[in-house]
Design a protein with these regions (language model features):
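C-terminal cap/loop subdomain of S1 sulfatases and analogous C-terminal strand-loop tails that border
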Residues: 13-17, 21, 26-131
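Generic detection of intrinsically disordered/low-complexity segments and helix-coil linkers/edges
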Residues: 3, 76-78, 146
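Short glycine/proline-rich turn/loop motifs
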Residues: 4, 8-13, 131, 141-142
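A structural signal for alpha-helix termini and helix-coil/disorder junctions
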Residues: 9, 38, 71, 163, ...
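Long, internal low-complexity/basic segments
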Residues: 99, 105, 111-120, 124-201
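Catalytic cores of eukaryotic secretory-pathway lumenal/extracellular enzymes that build
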Residues: 1-6, 118
Length: 201
């Protein structure tokens, strides 16, 4: 989930700068719009904004990070990232902490999703490869002790999760994500077969 991004804008973005704050590809549109002269586009679209004869009232998930890019601010405007697997919220990151709400125990895309009773807690600054989890070999007393000492961490994500869920309520997604779940596809096919009076078309 971490990829490099190189930006060059002579006279505006200082050369040779490293920025390691949280950013997302979702931020690019809002930030580039600000650079093009529309710094309030995200807020305008929330209220309804007309472009080329069409009024759009939508929620953009991105943050305007132009001040961060230009050095006017040393902190990213974004503090949180939400991780989805198709339509399922699997994790949330706030600052250096990541909470895995849903997991795939073997780390493979093919794995069944599982939802532990307590989120897996990772400090990404200490463990950027996310190797210290309850599924990891050798996660014994010290791992459990660290995990237990950080059970306060999920409370920090609460306000971010609440705001995210409110945005989905106020601005429902226009199109849901499809799924590649074979179980779901088979269940749907079986329901159609069980409907003896249903159409065969």
């Amino acid at each position: 989930m971490r990829v490099p991004c190189l930006i060059k804008w002579p006279g505006h973005i200082p050369a040779g700068q490293d920025r390691n704050g949280i950013q997302s590809h979702e931020d690019l549109f809002v930030t580039l719009a600000a650079a093009a002269g529309l710094p309030d586009l995200k807020q305008d679209l929330l209220k309804g904004y007309s472009m080329n004869g069409t009024t759009y009232k939508v929620h953009l998930d991105g943050y305007n990070n132009l001040d961060y890019w230009t050095g006017a601010s040393m902190r990213s405007a974004r503090r949180e990232i939400f991780y989805y697997d198709e339509t399922d919220l699997m994790a949330v990151r706030v600052d250096g902490w990541k909470l895995d709400i849903g997991v795939k125990h073997h780390g493979d895309w093919f794995d069944e999703k599982a939802y532990p009773s307590v989120p897996y807690i990772t400090n990404l600054l200490m463990d950027p490869m996310e190797r210290v989890t309850p599924d990891a070999p050798g996660f014994e007393y010290e791992g459990r002790k660290f995990f237990a000492s950080k059970l306060w961490a999920p409370t920090g994500a609460g306000p971010f999760l609440a705001a995210h869920l409110k945005s989905l309520e106020d601005y429902p997604p226009r199109q849901g994500a499809d799924t590649l779940s074979m179980k779901r596809a088979i269940d749907q096919a079986m329901r159609k077969l069980e409907n003896a009076h249903g159409s065969s078309n």
